[in-house]
């Protein structure tokens, strides 16, 4: 049976983020795109755009179960595109990491997509659909202050690799997006974060504050969404699709350069020599 209408489900469609841009792009291309937002999150921007939306907390099993029932009633049991976009960030040095905060982040960034795939896989198989997992260059390179976030995205990348293999008997495709820096508000919860008192990285306290409050050179989220949606609509999408600011050079160096090239680059960019000098000076004081 041929279906004229295709359906997409995009998680994490809060105002100003990648999800909002993705949902609008799928809609523009004639896909019936369904958005999710957190139960506590404002959804006026979706209602105003005529987008069907449902509340979802990807860390809550029952919330995912309830969403599936709602989606199935709209799509008659089919789902052509599942876009696991919901994600949060945690910026901190590895040695100063608050593990409870990291557990929360992994629950969203890693276990969230796992829950979605677990509950929606039958609808995707029914539609011979595509799973789109939104990864990051952070899962490829050791970007400073991002050890925990980078680890969550690396975990998602490797989960996606195996998922791609395991879904192949059912002709369900899995697209992993390696995102560069994109203009979103994902850092909004980090702007007031400081290094803890007494941290070995205290010499970089000012630089750390500047980092979490930075406005990096980024790709427009709408340009990004256009590229991702176009790739997901292909009959044979890439296994890994690199798009966004800085992805070209990072992809090249990751393929052809030695593994520690990033140590050389980031040591200088983030002024780690200042930390070393302070550490050595303290050692001399104690002698």
From Swiss-Prot:
PROSITE patterns: ADH_SHORT
UniProt keyword Nucleus present: no
InterPro entries the UniProt entry points to: NAD(P)-bd_dom_sf, Sc_DH/Rdtase_CS, SDR_fam
GO molecular function: acylglycerone-phosphate reductase (NADP+) activity; triacylglycerol lipase activity
Source taxon at top rank: Eukaryota
GO biological process: phosphatidic acid biosynthetic process; triglyceride catabolic process
Catalytic residues in the record: 149, 153
Pfam family, one: adh_short
Residues that bind NADP(+): 10, 36, 57, 85, 149, 153, 182, 184
EC numbers on record: 1.1.1.-
Protein keywords: NADP, Oxidoreductase
Name of the top EC class for this enzyme: oxidoreductase
GO cellular component terms listed in the entry, alphabetical order: endoplasmic reticulum; lipid droplet
Pathway(s) it belongs to: Secondary metabolite biosynthesis
Function, in words: Short-chain dehydrogenase; part of the gene cluster that mediates the biosynthesis of virensols and trichoxide, fungal natural products that contain or are derived from a salicylaldehyde core. The pathway begins with the synthesis of the reduced chain in virensol C by the highly reducing polyketide synthase virA via condensation of one acetate and 8 malonate units. VirA has interesting programming rules since the first 2 ketides are fully reduced, the 3 following ketides undergo beta-dehydration, and the last 3 ketides are only reduced to beta-hydroxys to yield the trihydroxy portion.
Family indicated by similarity: Belongs to the short-chain dehydrogenases/reductases (SDR) family.
Protein name: Short-chain dehydrogenase virD
The organism of origin for this protein: Hypocrea virens (strain Gv29-8 / FGSC 10586) (Gliocladium virens)
């Amino acid at each position: 049976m041929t279906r004229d209408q295709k359906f997409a489900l995009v998680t994490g469609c809060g105002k100003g983020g990648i999800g909002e841009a993705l949902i609008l792009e799928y809609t523009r291309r004639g896909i019936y795109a369904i958005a999710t937002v957190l139960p506590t999150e404002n959804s006026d921007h979706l209602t105003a755009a005529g987008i069907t939306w449902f509340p979802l907390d990807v860390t809550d099993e029952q919330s995912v179960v309830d969403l599936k029932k709602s989606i199935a009633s709209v799509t008659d049991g089919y789902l052509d595109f599942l876009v696991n976009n919901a994600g949060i960030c945690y910026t901190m040095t590895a040695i100063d990491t608050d593990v409870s905060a990291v557990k929360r982040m992994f629950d969203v960034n890693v276990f969230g997509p796992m829950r979605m795939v677990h509950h929606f896989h039958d609808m995707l198989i029914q539609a011979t659909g595509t799973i789109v997992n939104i990864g990051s260059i952070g899962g490829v390179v050791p970007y400073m202050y991002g050890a925990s976030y980078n680890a969550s995205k690396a975990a998602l990348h490797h989960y996606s690799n195996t998922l791609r293999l395991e879904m192949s008997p059912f002709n369900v495709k899995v697209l992993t997006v390696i995102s560069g820096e994109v203009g979103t508000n994902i850092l909004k919860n980090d702007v007031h974060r400081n290094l803890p008192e007494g941290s070995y990285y205290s010499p970089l306290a000012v630089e750390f504050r500047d980092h979490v409050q930075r406005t990096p050179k980024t790709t427009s989220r709408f340009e990004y969404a256009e590229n991702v949606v176009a790739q997901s609509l292909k009959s044979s999408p890439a296994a890994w699709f690199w798009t966004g600011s800085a992805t070209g050079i990072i992809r090249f160096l990751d393929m052809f350069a030695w593994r520690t090239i990033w140590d050389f680059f980031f040591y200088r960019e983030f002024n780690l020599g200042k930390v070393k000098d302070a550490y050595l000076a303290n050692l001399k004081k104690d002698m």
